[in-house]
Amino acid sequence: MYRKSTLAVLIALLTGAASAHAQTDLSTIEARLIALEKRLQEAENRAQTAENRAESAEKKVQQLTAQQQKNQDTTQEVAQRTAKLEKKADEKSGFEFHGYARSGVIMNDSGASTKSGAYMTPAGETGGAIGRLGNQADTYVEMNLEHKQTLDNGATTRFKVMVADGQTTYNDWTASTSDLNVRQAFVELGNLPTFAGPFKGSTLWAGKRFDRDNFDIHWIDSDVLFLAGTGGGIYDVKWNDSLRSNFSLYGRNFGDIDDSSNSVQNYILTMNHFAGPLQMMVSGLRAKDNDERKDTNGNLVKGDAANTGVHALLGLHNDSFYGLRDGSSKTALLYGHGLGAEVKGIGSDGALRSGADTWRIASYGTTPIGKNWSIAPAILAQSSKDRYVDGDSYQWATFNMRLIQEINQNFALAYEGSYQYMDLKPEGYNDRHAVNGSFYKLTFAPTFKVGSIGDFFSRPEIRFYTSWMDLSKKLNNYASDDALGSNGFNSGGEWSFGMQMETWF
């Protein structure tokens, strides 16, 4: 009995202890689970925070990327606009450089220097030029710098300066004999938006310049008309679709401009009208007290010099060879009285008498005459009376013809024949003597070009030439200081040889 009770008590005690121990373990596990759950929650919170930060960073990256792309697009757009503006500016404004030059060497058949030049004959003193091919030994250069711009309102501006120099020496250093000078410096204003009616599209100008509508006969190195000086005017006043006019006032000086007592200036007022191919120009000239002008020694220069004058030109500018065939041609009839009797270089001769009268005709043309040939004939003739002294007379006529034979695209043979007749009666002026007679010149010139071989007006050219010239013996007596009759050239004929370059652009 005792043993059974004891055993029961022992079992009860053991069972209670185990139960208490189990309850203790469950509480610990539960606490641990709660702590673990808390840590998991905290980890989840931290992960969520990190995820939120990552999403925020990604959004910022996307925003930055978008902004960068926008900036790139803006930069590209600005660059495109800038390029367009720069291109537009380049199209509207810019500098230009143009020029003319010739230079060459010439010798006679003895290997010595010889006389040459388009104005070497006695008639050359009054403008009687002869063919220039194979007849020039000088170096002459013109350099033109221009700046042009077009404003947003459509108005245009143009500034031009021209520097030129001429030399007859073959040396490379020629400062002591230089004729370097500024021949042009002027400004033009065109298409002014406030100009209306006939003045719409016209061009104002002022400064020192060659007149825009001068023209010449290149093969004899002679201007048909050369109006130049310092002044101002207006071009292209349009009265209707076919009639336009130019108006200008030029000033020139006579005599030594460094002489403080010389105040004589020649003013030239010009009206120049164009109707289709026709040109009509009228000019009035005035040089107050020209007959009282004195030299640097105080001596009267010319007591019968003219103080006024008139000049007129009637021209025809064809885009065909005298209306007969393809090509071009220009013809002009000129008249001058008093100061206007120097009909080529208007207003350039202050020694003309008030009764001086001059008539001149000039004409030239160019045309192809076969597959490989082109021809350019020219005529220049003048009659001038009472020019420098009462009763004097200067009459002459030049006939010139140049031919080009194309050999290939870079080589041609050029031929030129020039004939001049003159009947000069200076009546003792400047110790000149009355003469009459003829001058002849023939030239053969193998010529190299880069292209447009048959075009009379394309350059540059390099020529090798030989020329034969002769004159009437009577012309030797005209003067002691001109080319003809001097030790360098006499009647009887002379051969000359040389080479020359010529260019313009």
Question: Which residues does each predicted region cover?
Answer:
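Extracellular structured ligand-interaction cores
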Residues: 94-96, 138-142, 156-160, 182-184, ...
